[in-house]
Amino acid sequence: MNEKDLKLMVEQLVSQMVGQVDMQSVEKVVKEVSKNQSQVESDEFIPDITEIDIKKQLLVDNPADREAYLEMKAKTPARLGSGRAGARYKTITALRMRADHAAAQDSVFSDVSEEFIKKNNFIPVKTMCTDKDEYVTRPDLGRRFSPETTEIIKEKCDKNPKVQIMVGDGLSSAAIEANVEDILPSIEQGLKMYGLNVGPILFVKYCRVPAMDAVGEATGADVVCLLVGERPGLVTAESMSAYIAYKPKVGMPEAKRTVISNIHKGGTTAVEAGAHIAELIKTMLDKKASGIDLK
């Protein structure tokens, strides 16, 4: 039987099947399905799988030692015990991976809201980047300010303060909105115990870490502390870092900075980090050094 004969046979079978179908029954079923589709169940919802704590989620079928497996998972956010469906990941594992990746992408390409900036009384400024694409592809522009912006910084901030705090969106706007409101009161309270006051706080859009050097030069601050969003990953999109330097200058070595990283609810909490930052700032002022010079 050649291809032409096979095609003819299939066409005949399809024609016979169509002829046996009751079209009235088909129309009735279609109307019923359409009617049901238009009805929305108000009490139904799609659960957010990103809210599941993967440290407590074991997807291996019939594990030999469930308790030991969960004990191991509790010590790491790694995706252990994800199970298999044949040779592949289970659907929930694949969906969670895509959801976490999407959250990471969103945190990079979204902006800190204007309402958040106004609510916290930040002084908004911007580096020389014009948009997110340029920020990602031109790191050098995220380190510098225009002459006009530099003048705004000089005008709005205290002159020659002991401490200048600044907030930068960095690579995660989600990290800033999730942590800043908890960490700032902790820093301010800690510094107050040492007799240090915090002046106006800058918010820098399209901020790279060395932008703090330009702020240090513009304000003449003894210590500059930058709270900035870290590059997100699949574990969390809300991790923030604090970069602190004594008398930072443009072009200074990276080794002169002290950094506290992994500030988020699953790492170092914002309140705990704030207390540590205040202590570090006091140490820098006493020893007139930062980074490896503190060692």
UniProtKB/Swiss-Prot annotation:
One of its GO terms (cellular component) is ethanolamine ammonia-lyase complex. Pathway: Amine and polyamine degradation; ethanolamine degradation. One of its GO terms (molecular function) is ethanolamine ammonia-lyase activity. Keywords: Bacterial microcompartment, Cobalamin, Cobalt, Lyase. Gene3D superfamilies: Ethanolamine ammonia-lyase light chain (EutC) (3.40.50.11240), Ethanolamine ammonia-lyase light chain (EutC), N-terminal domain (1.10.30.40). Its EC number is 4.3.1.7. It is an enzyme of class 4 (lyase). It is found in: Bacterial microcompartment. Its main location: other. Binds between the large and small subunits. Belongs to the EutC family. Catalyzes the deamination of various vicinal amino-alcohols to oxo compounds. Allows this organism to utilize ethanolamine as the sole source of nitrogen and carbon in the presence of external vitamin B12. The basic unit is a heterodimer which dimerizes to form tetramers. The heterotetramers trimerize; 6 large subunits form a core ring with 6 small subunits projecting outwards. This is Ethanolamine ammonia-lyase small subunit. It comes from Clostridium perfringens (strain 13 / Type A). The lineage of its organism: Bacteria, Bacillati, Bacillota, Clostridia, Eubacteriales.
